[in-house]
């Protein structure tokens, strides 16, 4: 699994929110996420992800090579791996993959209900109304949803509106 969720990053927004997500997945409270704990993170974000993708992600974001993802590495995962947009083909492919993660019904648009569902899976407590507000910040065409072009633009602006 490559870059996955700039929408989550922009919705979480603050370091405190990212810490809460980290703590939710750090089941044993040791301040680091193991491979098994990472599997749960990935399952919440992408139920169809393969075990190989978990291993790849661990290698990519375990910056100090100790076999765990600590809070700093988790933040990097959100800032670089999950939220990073760009111009090369892999980045566009990664963005498309991230977009599809939220587009649960596959209609090419992320609705407030879809965003709410993903946020809920991540343990975030936000209402559908909160998600509508988040979407309205990047909804250029005013249809109440985020299409892929709006998603790309949001990500090229650093994950926020």
UniProtKB/Swiss-Prot annotation:
Keywords: Calcium, Metal-binding, Repeat. GO terms for molecular function: calcium ion binding. The keyword Repeat applies. SMART domains: EFh. Disulfide bonds: none annotated. Residues 13-48, 49-84, 90-125, 126-161 form the EF-hand domain. Ca(2+) 3 binds at residues 103, 105, 107, 109, 114. It comes from the Eukaryota. Ca(2+) 1 binds at residues 26, 28, 30, 32, 37. Expressed in seed coat, seedling radical, cotyledons, hypocotyl, shoot apex and elongating root. Expressed in the vasculature of cotyledons, leaves and roots. Highly expressed in guard cells, trichomes and hydathodes. Expressed in inflorescence stem branch points, silique abscission zone, young and mature styles and stigmatic papillae, mature anthers and developing seed. GO terms for biological process: innate immune response; long-day photoperiodism, flowering; regulation of flower development; regulation of nitric oxide metabolic process; response to abscisic acid; response to absence of light; response to auxin; response to calcium ion. Ca(2+) 2 binds at residues 62, 64, 66, 73. The keyword Zinc-finger does not apply. Induction: By rain-, wind-, and touch (thigmomorphogenesis), dark, heat and cold treatments, hydrogen peroxide, ABA and auxin. Ca(2+) 4 binds at residues 139, 141, 143, 145, 150. Calcium-binding protein that may positively regulate abscisic acid (ABA) inhibition of germination and seedling development. May be required for photoperiod-induced flowering and function in ion homeostasis. This is Calcium-binding protein CML24. It comes from Arabidopsis thaliana (Mouse-ear cress). The lineage of its organism: Eukaryota, Viridiplantae, Streptophyta, Embryophyta, Tracheophyta.
């Amino acid at each position: 699994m490559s870059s996955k969720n700039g929408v989550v990053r922009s919705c979480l927004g603050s370091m405190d929110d990212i810490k809460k997500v980290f703590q939710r997945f750090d089941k044993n409270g040791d301040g680091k996420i193991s491979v098994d704990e990472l599997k749960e993170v990935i399952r919440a974000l992408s139920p169809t992800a393969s075990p190989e993708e978990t291993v790849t992600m661990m290698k990519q974001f375990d910056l100090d090579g100790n076999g765990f993802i600590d809070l700093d590495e988790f933040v990097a995962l959100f800032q670089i791996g999950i939220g990073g947009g760009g111009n090369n083909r892999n980045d566009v492919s990664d963005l498309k993959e991230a977009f599809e993660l939220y587009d649960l019904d596959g209609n090419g648009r992320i609705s407030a209900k879809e965003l709410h569902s993903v946020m809920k899976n991540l343990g975030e407590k936000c209402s559908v109304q909160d998600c509508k507000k988040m979407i309205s910040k990047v909804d250029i065409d005013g249809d109440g949803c985020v299409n892929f072009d709006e998603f790309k633009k949001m990500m090229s602006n650093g994950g926020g509106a």
